């Protein structure tokens, strides 16, 4: 697959460090691609878990992936404001099948009031031992937690006040075509 164009759809596949498929999102609409990043939107998107369970996303969400940073960001647009779910994960790759990354368990959730929570530390520690995460991965992930918190605190990139509005409006324009 070449670089997807604005308005096209991609599948997103999340893997675990041991190589098994963790979760799949069908039909994420691409809003923008650049040399290093992809911005898309999920809106009532079918999600399939590794155990076969399926569910559909409840609200629109702007997704941000980068080829250099070890995280991806989901901005969920809800009635009470935007909530962010940030996955500590490998940089993404794109092939003929899907956009793919490795999920490293740690997550940061940002609530509409700005409260931040680091989630799934126990899961990270368990999988780190079970799947034998290398020390350099542990170091990279911890450094990227710092980068992510800096972005959140300084409203950089997907955390800027205008970001969600701009990309949600673009999604609405594209979905009317």
Swiss-Prot record:
UniProt keyword annotations, A-Z: Hydrolase, Magnesium, Metal-binding
Keyword Metal-binding in record: yes
Top EC category: hydrolase
Keyword Magnesium assigned: yes
Molecular function terms, GO-annotated: magnesium ion binding; nucleoside diphosphate phosphatase activity; ribonucleoside triphosphate phosphatase activity
Reactions catalysed, as given in the entry: a ribonucleoside 5'-triphosphate + H2O = a ribonucleoside 5'-diphosphate + phosphate + H(+); a ribonucleoside 5'-diphosphate + H2O = a ribonucleoside 5'-phosphate + phosphate + H(+)
Residues reported to bind Mg(2+) 1: 87, 103, 107
Catalytic activity, EC: 3.6.1.15, 3.6.1.6
Cofactors (names): Mg(2+)
Residues reported to bind Mg(2+) 2: 105, 107, 120, 123
InterPro entries according to UniProt: DUF402, FomD-like_sf, Ntdp-like, SA1684
Active site: 23
Known role: Has nucleoside phosphatase activity towards nucleoside triphosphates and nucleoside diphosphates.
Family: Belongs to the Ntdp family.
Protein's name in the database: Nucleoside triphosphate/diphosphate phosphatase
Organism from which the protein derives: Enterococcus faecalis (strain ATCC 700802 / V583)
Source species taxonomy: Bacteria, Bacillati, Bacillota, Bacilli, Lactobacillales
């Amino acid at each position: 697959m070449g670089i997807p164009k604005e308005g096209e759809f991609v599948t997103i596949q999340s893997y675990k460090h041991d190589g098994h498929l963790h979760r799949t999102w069908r039909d994420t609409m691409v809003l923008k691609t650049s040399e290093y990043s992809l911005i898309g939107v999920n809106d009532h998107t079918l999600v399939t878990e590794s155990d076969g369970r399926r569910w559909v996303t409840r609200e629109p969400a702007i997704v941000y992936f980068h080829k250099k940073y070890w995280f991806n960001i989901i901005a969920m647009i809800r009635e009470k404001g935007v909530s962010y779910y940030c996955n500590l994960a490998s940089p993404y790759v794109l092939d003929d099948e899907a956009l793919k990354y490795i999920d490293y368990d740690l997550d940061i959730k940002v609530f509409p009031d700005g409260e931040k929570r680091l989630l799934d530390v126990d899961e990270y520690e368990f999988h780190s031992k079970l799947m034998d995460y290398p020390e350099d991965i542990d170091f990279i992930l911890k450094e990227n937690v710092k980068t992510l918190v800096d972005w959140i605190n300084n409203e950089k990139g997907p955390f800027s006040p205008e970001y969600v509005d701009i990309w949600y409006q673009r999604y609405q324009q594209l979905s009317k075509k």
